[in-house]
Design a protein with these regions (language model features):
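RNA-binding basic/glycine-rich loop and surface signature characteristic of RAMP-family CRISPR effectors
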Residues: 2-266
């Protein structure tokens, strides 16, 4: 998400990305902060200084989204981010793992064979599901202290864009074949006090071997949960690639569907 925002929203400030100095060594946290906010001066009053630092930190979109533990002298701050992401779990039944050697283009010494520098292990096919929650209330109190609005609608829009495009857009040989497959986004009403369970274990992914060879994402158990709290739901969005994927089981719910490739409504 950070990498996508850094590349495609260059006007946004990001605190927790690697930066290098003139010697090509990574900057420290304090050096990175100083680079982002060169106008920041040490306030004589410790409380005022901490609030000034907090205001600066909240101008960074990654901190508004994910929070931070910021530890520099005189301004230790912990911000509980509105966005929480769990570890991905593979919900595809077949787990075919294979390994391959990585060879260097050079010999270790004159006359020797090409050097093997290691091996990499890959999964033939997997469909990793991540449960993501967004609770703006996590940051309300600390944003109020810093006279900041906290997480904005524009922040959420950029988050969703990154969640539907970030993996596909990432340039890396290790992720070849990895793409954003689907995003199910459920928004509760502003006054709702309900908390939805983790959807990860409620999803399964199979292959439609009889017809199209598409990957079929089954959401029947999620639909059962959402049907019980339908009065609390403001909207449901589903982003997926209809060329390669089918999503089933959300019948009975009002769902706005979008093509994850084009971004257009379907």
């Amino acid at each position: 998400v950070r990498d996508y925002i850094r590349k495609y929203s260059p006007s946004e400030k990001l605190m927790y990305v690697q930066r290098e100095g003139k010697d090509f060594k990574p900057l420290t946290l304090e050096q990175s902060y100083g680079l982002l906010f060169p106008e920041q001066k040490k306030e004589s009053d410790e409380t005022k200084h901490r609030l000034a630092v907090l205001t600066n930190l909240l101008s960074c979109i990654d901190i508004r989204l994910f929070g931070a533990t910021f530890a520099i002298k005189g301004a230790n701050t912990s911000i509980h981010g509105p966005v929480q992401v769990n570890h991905g779990i593979n919900r595809f039944p077949a787990n075919e793992i294979y390994s391959e050697q990585i060879k260097a283009p050079f010999a270790s010494e004159a006359g020797a064979d090409m050097t093997t520098i290691g091996s990499q292990t890959n999964l033939r096919e997997g469909h990793y599901v991540f449960h993501i929650t967004v609770n703006p209330k996590n940051i309300e109190e600390i944003a109020k202290a810093a006279t900041h609005d906290g997480i904005s609608t524009d922040d959420i829009t950029k988050l969703k864009e990154a969640l539907t495009r970030g993996v596909t857009a990432l340039d890396s040989s290790r992720k070849i074949g990895s793409e954003n497959e689907a995003l199910l986004w459920v928004t509760l009403k502003a006054d709702s006090t309900k908390h939805l369970p983790n959807f990860t274990e409620l999803i399964s992914v199979k292959i439609d071997t009889e017809k199209s060879e598409k990957r079929v994402i089954h959401c029947e158990r999620i639909a059962e949960v959402l049907a019980r709290v339908s009065a609390e739901i403001d909207s449901i969005e589903l982003h997926y690639n209809p060329t390669t994927t089918s999503v089933v089981g959300l019948t009975g719910l009002t769902v706005k569907a979008f093509d994850i490739v084009s971004g257009q409504a379907m």
